[in-house]
Design a protein with these regions (language model features):
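Short, structured motif recognition centered on aromatic/hydrophobic residues
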Residues: 41-48, 64, 84, 91-93, ...
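N-terminal beta-strand motif that seeds the catalytic metal site of vicinal oxygen chelate
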Residues: 17-52, 114-117, 179-227, 291-301, ...
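Core segments of cupin and vicinal oxygen chelate
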Residues: 17, 36-39, 45-90, 133, ...
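A cross-kingdom feature marking solvent-exposed beta-strand/loop segments within repeated
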Residues: 68-80, 92, 97-116, 121, ...
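C-terminal functional regions that serve as terminal interaction/effector modules
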Residues: 22-23, 35, 39, 48, ...
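Short, Lys/Arg-enriched N-terminal segments with co-localized hydrophobic residues
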Residues: 7-17
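Acidic, Ala/Val/Gly-enriched low-complexity intrinsically disordered segments
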Residues: 2-6
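Extended catalytic-interface subdomain
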Residues: 112-117, 133, 139-250, 255-257, ...
Length: 412
């Protein structure tokens, strides 16, 4: 479990076993008989207080296309849901239509946030049964939905907190390739007619391509439990480990272990707080998430960080701020590792983008402010130029920026 994978410097995704769903990845021999072989993140489902209003927020601020819906008019009596897509990122925004529905109750308890990270597999029922044999707790048993267009099978297991991993398998017109291209999502989903922002977003793209990684926050002392869970239940491998010496400031610190699916599909860092003089960002998250673990942020990959951040800022997205003094030394730090940042240095500084490097290349990254009033879920916008790391050289500047925001909120 503690062995690291071998990594390809020229690939966009980590792992010696590469996914064919990612740009520039190299096809390799993989075990097609493994029921837990993951093809892709099928979608990420959010519970929202008002899914229709949230759809406008994500469409305008982040450039998502609002493509399909399911509500009372389509026969959904319990929930209203909207499917948003950008590149190979698919978000479902879902709200409960009755006060006793789980979605409504969880929003009241935890606020808007990620409920489900769904994983595409060949056979959802077989994947579910294997995961249960590996020690997972059931979220719900296999459900098959079929109509004249095809079949979708879903089955879920429980991860940390209230988070589910739903296995999804697709056939017919609901196949993964069709879904990636914006085709039919599943039985009961209808195409959105005129949505005023869709044409605008096509003409003014934000350039977000796919989910690079997805980070969870858990309680003190629970990180290793969930690292072992992902290894034993889903066959993930430990990719990187950061301790309080790596991720600390004068006041706070945390620990993190990064788990990789082994097929280049998804990486899932898991954070826990460490001892510090003040309340860490993980503790703040847990406080405002009713003491319950959950998804802290989604990192969304772009091939053009400067364009994406510029467009997102133009649309009103608020990002964490680092002082201009950060740029006094970052270029030499990256150059000392053997890399010249090709993007315009002045524009990077003007946009407040963070830069880091390792022995495989460099990366550009920036983090949004929380996406809702509670200081919980946020997005990261990341571009990789060979680097397979997570911005270790930026940890101090980043967490000092987070601490400044915590202090403004009265939570440090």
């Amino acid at each position: 479990m503690d062995s690291a994978l071998a990594y390809n410097k020229n690939s966009l995704m980590e792992g010696s076993i590469m996914s064919q769903t990612r740009p520039n990845s190299d096809p390799v021999e993989i075990d097609a008989s493994d029921p837990l072989r993951l093809h892709d993140v099928d979608h990420v489902r959010f519970y929202c207080g008002n899914a229709k209003q949230a759809a406008y927020f994500y469409a305008w601020n982040f450039g998502f296309q609002v493509e399909q819906y399911r509500d009372l008019t389509t026969g959904s009596r319990d929930t209203a849901s909207y499917l948003l897509r950008q590149g190979n990122i698919r978000l479902i925004l879902e709200t409960g239509l009755t006060t006793d529905h789980e979605a409504a109750q969880e929003v009241a308890t935890y606020g808007d946030g990620v409920k489900d990270v769904s994983l595409n597999v060949d056979d959802a029922e077989a994947a579910y049964e294997q995961a249960i044999r590996n020690g997972a707790e059931s979220g719900y048993e296999p459900i098959e939905e079929t109509d004249e267009h095809g079949t979708v099978v879903r089955a879920a297991i429980r991860s940390y907190g209230r988070v589910l991993h739903t296995f999804v398998s697709r056939k017919g017109d609901y196949g993964l390739d069709a879904v990636r291209a914006g085709g039919r999502f599943g039985p009961g989903w209808e195409k959105v007619g005129h949505f005023p922002l869709n044409e605008y977003n096509q003409q003014n793209p934000c350039g977000l391509e796919f989910v690079d990684h997805l980070v969870g926050n858990v309680e003190l002392g629970k990180m290793n439990h969930w690292v072992e869970w992902y290894a034993e239940v889903l066959g993930f491998k430990l990719f990187k480990h950061f301790d309080e010496a790596d991720i600390s400031t004068e006041y706070t610190s945390l620990m993190s272990k990064v788990m990789d699916s082994g097929f280049g599909v998804i990486k899932m860092p898991i954070n826990e707080p460490a001892d510090g003089r003040r309340k860490s960002q993980i503790e703040e998250y847990l406080d405002w998430h009713n003491g319950t673990p959950g998804v802290q942020h989604l990192a969304l990959r772009t091939d053009d960080e400067l364009h994406s951040v510029h467009e997102l800022r133009r649309r009103g997205v608020n990002f964490l701020k680092v002082p201009q003094s950060y740029y006094d030394e970052v270029w030499e730090r990256v150059k000392a590792l053997g890399w010249d940042v090709k993007e315009d240095h002045e524009k990077i500084a003007d946009l407040g983008i963070l830069v880091d490097a390792d022995d495989e290349g460099y990366l550009l990254q920036l983090f949004t402010q929380p996406l809702q009033d509670r200081p919980t879920l946020f997005f990261e916008i990341i571009s990789r130029r060979g680097s397979q790391s997570f911005g270790k050289g930026n940890f101090k500047a980043l967490f000092e920026a987070i601490e400044r925001e915590q202090a403004r909120r009265g939570n440090l």
